[in-house]
């Protein structure tokens, strides 16, 4: 980014610190878009690629947030040294992880112990607890995103009451928030400013998709010998950028960082390019690499939620006239 911005034909110059800030805001990926596209095509993934992509997407959001905040502080305060940056990272990580663990345990206990007559209030209670977790962690100078992520992992992997109602509510709320975010972010964009950074943004986007993402994926997966080459190639391709990078790009704008408007426009442009190029080709690449499987049809559970400790399941079956004729009545 810094090298490209120094070219005379770009008419754009970003200092090394601002270039790092731009890279930090773009480091978050969105696996939810990948799975939404696959579900629309009635496809699933082999080799447990889904949990790997979910882990990556969920874990890189807190890190992208920390990098963005620390780099903004570094740019605004020239006296901030490497030691202060490292200390800020450690404090945010430790406080965020500890708060997420403790409050996640508290959320599990609260959901299972409280007896609310109206079961529709359980998802509302958990949503309020999410905001509480983020707020109290941020008040303690920790990473609120990391705390919410860890608390969510704990709640999702423990036995809780009304799990299905909570999941359905949160899934719908996720889509609603994504629609609102893209609508609000679209209102912040000026088309003529997008044209000014189009060439540089396109080159950065191509570099990220073709070189940066595959290189980082292959380096990170080197210790995992059992992951096939096709799986590595697919993970390299599906590094979609969603609304989160655009949200992080608004932080420099709010902080009045030099070149912040340019950062926002570049991030927005790259996100749109990523969604168009990678988003439209996810299912094609999965089929090309023979990593797609038909989406398993789930039966009708008739609105009944069985406790997890009961080793049984509900299934539905269509009764035909031939079956009735052959039955012993």
PLM feature segments, named:
Residues 292-329:
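Cytosolic regulatory domains of K+ homeostasis systems
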């Amino acid at each position: 980014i810094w090298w490209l911005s120094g070219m005379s034909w770009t008419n754009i110059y970003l200092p090394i610190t601002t270039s790092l800030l731009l890279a930090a805001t773009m480091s978050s990926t969105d696996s939810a878009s990948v799975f939404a596209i696959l579900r629309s095509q009635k496809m699933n993934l082999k080799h447990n690629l889904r949990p790997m992509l979910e882990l990556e997407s969920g874990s890189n959001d807190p890190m992208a947030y920390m990098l963005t905040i620390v780099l903004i502080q570094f740019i605004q305060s020239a006296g901030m040294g490497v030691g202060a940056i490292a200390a800020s990272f450690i404090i945010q990580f430790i406080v965020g992880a500890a708060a997420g663990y403790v409050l996640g345990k508290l959320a599990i206990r609260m959901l299972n112990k409280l007896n609310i007559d109206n079961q529709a209030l359980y998802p509302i209670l958990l949503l309020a607890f999410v905001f509480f977790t983020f707020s109290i962690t941020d008040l303690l100078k920790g990473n609120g995103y990391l705390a919410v992520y860890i608390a969510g992992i704990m709640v999702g992997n423990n036995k809780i009451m009304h799990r299905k109602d909570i999941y359905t509510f949160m899934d719908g709320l996720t889509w609603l928030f994504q629609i609102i975010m893209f609508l609000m972010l679209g209102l912040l964009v000026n088309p003529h400013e997008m044209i000014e950074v189009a060439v540089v943004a396109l080159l950065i986007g191509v570099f990220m998709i073709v070189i940066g993402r595959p290189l980082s994926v292959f380096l990170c997966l080197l210790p995992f010998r059992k992951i096939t080459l096709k799986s590595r190639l697919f993970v390299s391709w599906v590094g979609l950028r969603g609304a989160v990078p655009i949200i992080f790009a608004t932080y420099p704008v709010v902080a009045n960082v030099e070149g912040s408007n340019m950062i926002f426009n570049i991030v927005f442009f790259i996100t749109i390019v990523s969604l168009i190029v990678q988003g439209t080709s996810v299912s094609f690449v999965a089929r090309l690499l023979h990593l797609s499987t038909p989406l398993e049809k789930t039966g009708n559970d008739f609105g009944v939620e069985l406790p997890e400790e009961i080793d049984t399941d509900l299934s539905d079956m269509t009764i035909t006239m031939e079956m009735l004729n052959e039955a012993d009545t």
